[in-house]
């Protein structure tokens, strides 16, 4: 089956931004103008095509990354609409991993928000070329150039406006195209009657000034163009387009566009810019991976190369499990067998589909550069590599953040027990930041996630999709333990009960590890003080104790254990005895190494009318928060602070009552920090009382 679009005419793009910047509305308009939908759907009406979960349509927010294919100007455009709420960061993370380019949407009034910075960092992590669409230019307080300044200052981006708005707020009537040096005037509400015109006389000087700045920015990235620009002070439209595209691909330029998706202004120009400036799969570096022998290799974006793809999302579906894949090389055919090289198992490809939100089109093949979904995979989860069984490779996987909040969950009736187990398994397969575990002390099922809204939506889905009624406990913070100094630890387990006894003896040196290393074990036993077969059980004993904690029952992180000595008995020693001795040595060492409790600190940003600033700062301080910055803009105060997650439960309700419903806030995980001694003592005694 031949390609319907050559690779250089394929664009895999994401639409990403902070909550309420208008990403989903922008996607809706793109689908309308490119002919995928024939009626415009609004987020606030609960009719958006890409918001296809019941919860998304009710809440007016996008939770999961919906993948949709469309076409524009003879190009195939595969779009992923990502959520802007910080609790759903994994959805943005996994879409960034598989995209070639991003449209970052900003609100012309709100500008750069905390979540915009998070999304920008994620795009940086995966080196994704991007362009900016400043949306909501029709809103009161809209200011395109103010947002430009914020993007340069706060995101340190090499932004370059390639458009200017004609009018703003209620008077937005058109857009100046600085590349073509002309204006587009919108003649009807649907945005389908557009007149090409001269730049309005009252904006000619401003447009000339910004066009000169654009030519300078473009020329800086290209030696030939800079020579011509210095000689003539002018670049042609074709030179500008080529220069902007080269700058975007080299991460040296971020073109900025403007408009109002809701008012149907500027969206077709965004599509033109996607085609003109964002990369095709062949324009980005080939994907890297590791071969079976451990050596590094690359897979070019080519139908003739060996097949390789990355599973970036798993979704429960009425027709079975859908696994979304990004094709990097080769061809994937329906009915074929492939290798999951991450798990070293073979999988059969039952069916292949291309998605248009909750509508789907079955296809016989997916090719290099495609985004599609596979039905029938049994063992594949998010981040796994699928490849040609004869040309095995493991591709770079995803960064998956650790959950910061947990709640106990139990079925309301015994009959729901099995359904609950099924629901939790299915939801954790879909979402790698959603973890399920069993509390060994209480036997309770504990679910963990990225925030209150994240868990609320998942519990809601259990009820709607799996018909499971469950009781939910109070949220619990995911504390961690660590050590601050070094010491030796010793564990000796000896038991004689007639006949064969038990004997294991372990001596370790314990010290703080590098941040992010978790548990690290080094074996330095020499001279056979402990036989080789007992080293691994001793390590396992330490590791299990590390996972269950020592001072308050929370996992220990960043600890390095070196096994230096021990002893054994020819008859009585066993793997179990050394596992227990390893655990005893670990506990002994931790107690001597100045153990401390760590808690998740959240980066909190609050926006309130100026009159409420004093009470907001006072309230944050009472929550053990540290205010790190504040600014006032147009009567709105912005406060940024670091606050322990433990103090933030119920903050949304409190903020509403303090500001008469006029305050908003966002919160995302920052890092783990030591809990103050008086607070730690209360947590430790409470947890020791529970155990």
Curated annotation (Swiss-Prot):
Binding site for GTP: 17-24, 81-85, 135-138
Localization (cell): Cytoplasm
Alphabetized Gene3D superfamilies for the sequence: 3.30.230.10, 3.30.70.240, Elongation Factor G (Translational Gtpase), domain 3, P-loop containing nucleotide triphosphate hydrolases, Translation factors
CDD domains, per database record: EF-G (cd01886), EFG_III (cd16262), EFG_mtEFG1_IV (cd01434), EFG_mtEFG_C (cd03713), EFG_mtEFG_II (cd04088)
GO terms classed as biological process: ribosome disassembly
Primary subcellular site in the record, as a coarse category: cytoplasm
Matching InterPro entries: EFG_II (IPR041095), EFG_III (IPR009022), EFG_III/V (IPR035647), EFG_IV (IPR047872), EFG_V (IPR035649), EFG_V-like (IPR000640), EFTu-like_2 (IPR004161), G_TR_CS (IPR031157)
Pfam families: EFG_C, EFG_III, EFG_IV, GTP_EFTU, GTP_EFTU_D2
PROSITE patterns: G_TR_1, G_TR_2
Cysteine-cysteine disulfides: none
Annotated ranges, domain tr-type G: 8-282
Key words of the record: Cytoplasm, Elongation factor, GTP-binding, Nucleotide-binding, Protein biosynthesis
Record family assignment: Belongs to the TRAFAC class translation factor GTPase superfamily. Classic translation factor GTPase family. EF-G/EF-2 subfamily.
HAMAP family membership: EF_G_EF_2_B
NCBIfam families, per database record: EF-G, PRK12740.1-3, PRK12740.1-5, small_GTP
Stated role: Catalyzes the GTP-dependent ribosomal translocation step during translation elongation. During this step, the ribosome changes from the pre-translocational (PRE) to the post-translocational (POST) state as the newly formed A-site-bound peptidyl-tRNA and P-site-bound deacylated tRNA move to the P and E sites, respectively. Catalyzes the coordinated movement of the two tRNA molecules, the mRNA and conformational changes in the ribosome.
UniProt name for this protein: Elongation factor G
């Amino acid at each position: 089956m031949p390609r319907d679009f050559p690779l250089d005419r394929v664009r895999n793009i994401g639409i990403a931004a902070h909550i309420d910047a208008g990403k989903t509305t922008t996607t809706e308009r793109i689908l309308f103008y490119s002919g995928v939908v024939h009626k415009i759907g609004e987020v606030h009406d609960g009719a958006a095509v890409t918001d296809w979960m019941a919860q998304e349509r009710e809440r007016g927010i996008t939770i999961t990354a919906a993948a949709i294919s469309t076409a524009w100007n003879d190009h195939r455009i595969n779009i992923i609409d990502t959520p802007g709420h910080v609790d759903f960061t994994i959805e943005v993370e996994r879409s960034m991993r598989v995209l070639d380019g991003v449209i970052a949407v900003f609100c012309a009034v709100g500008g750069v928000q905390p979540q915009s910075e998070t999304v920008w960092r994620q795009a940086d992590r995966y080196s994704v070329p991007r362009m900016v669409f400043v949306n909501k230019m029709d809103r009161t307080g809209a200011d395109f150039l103010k947002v430009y300044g914020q993007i340069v200052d706060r995101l340190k981006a090499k932004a370059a406006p390639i458009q200017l708005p004609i009018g703003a707020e209620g008077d937005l009537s058109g857009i100046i195209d600085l590349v073509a040096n002309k204006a587009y005037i919108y003649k009807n509400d649907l945005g389908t009657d557009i007149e090409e015109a001269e730049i309005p006389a009252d904006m000619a000087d401003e447009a000339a000034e910004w066009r000169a700045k654009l030519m300078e920015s473009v020329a800086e990235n290209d030696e030939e163009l800079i020579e011509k620009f210095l000689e003539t002070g002018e670049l042609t439209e074709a030179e500008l387009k080529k220069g902007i595209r080269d700058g975007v691909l080299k991460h040296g330029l971020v073109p900025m566009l403007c408009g109002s998706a809701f008012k149907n202004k500027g969206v077709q120009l965004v599509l033109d810019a996607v085609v003109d400036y964002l990369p095709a799969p062949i324009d980005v570096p080939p994907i890297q991976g590791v071969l079976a022998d451990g050596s590094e290799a690359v897979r070019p974006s080519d139908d003739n190369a060996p097949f390789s793809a990355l599973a970036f999302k798993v979704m429960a579906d009425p027709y079975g499990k859908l696994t979304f894949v990004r094709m990097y090389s080769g061809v994937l055919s329906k009915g074929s067998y492939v290798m999951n090289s991450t798990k070293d198992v073979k999988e059969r490809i039952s069916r292949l589909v291309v998605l248009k939100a909750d509508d789907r089109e079955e296809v016989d093949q997916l090719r290099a550069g495609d985004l599609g979904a596979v039905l029938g995979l049994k063992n594949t989860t998010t981040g796994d590599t699928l490849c040609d069984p004869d040309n095995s490779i493991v591709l770079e996987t995803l960064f998956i953040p650790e959950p910061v909040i947990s709640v106990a969950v139990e079925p309301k009736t015994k009959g729901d027990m099995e359904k609950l187990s099924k629901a939790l398994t299915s939801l954790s397969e879909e979402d790698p930041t959603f973890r399920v575990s069993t509390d060994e002390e209480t036997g309770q099922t504990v679910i963990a996630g990225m925030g209150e809204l994240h868990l609320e939506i998942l519990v809601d889905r259990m009820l709607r999709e799996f018909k499971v009624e469950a009781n939910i406990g109070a949220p619990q913070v995911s504390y961690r333990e660590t050590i601050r100094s070094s010491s030796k630890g010793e564990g000796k387990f000896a038991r004689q009960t007639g006949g064969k006894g038990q004997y294991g003896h372990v001596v370790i040196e314990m010290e703080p590890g590098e941040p992010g290393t978790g548990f690290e074990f080094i074996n330095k036993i020499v001279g056979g003080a402990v036989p080789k077969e007992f080293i691994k059980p001793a390590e396992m004993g330490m590791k299990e104790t590390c996972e269950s904690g020592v001072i308050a029952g929370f996992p220990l992180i960043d600890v390095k254990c070196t096994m230096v000595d021990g002893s054994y008995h020819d008859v009585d020693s066993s793997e179990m005895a050394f596992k227990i001795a390893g655990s005893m040595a670990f506990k002994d060492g931790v107690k001597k190494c100045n153990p401390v409790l760590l808690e998740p600190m959240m980066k909190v940003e609050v926006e309130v009318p100026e009159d409420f600033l004093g009470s907001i700062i006072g309230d944050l301080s009472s929550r053990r928060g540290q205010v790190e910055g504040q600014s006032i803009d147009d009567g709105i105060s912005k406060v940024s602070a670091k606050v322990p997650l433990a103090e933030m439960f119920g903050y949304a309700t409190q903020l509403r009552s303090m500001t008469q419903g006029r305050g908003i806030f966002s919160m995302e995980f920052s890092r783990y920090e030591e809990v103050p001694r008086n607070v730690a003592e209360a947590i430790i005694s409470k947890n020791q009382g529970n155990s």
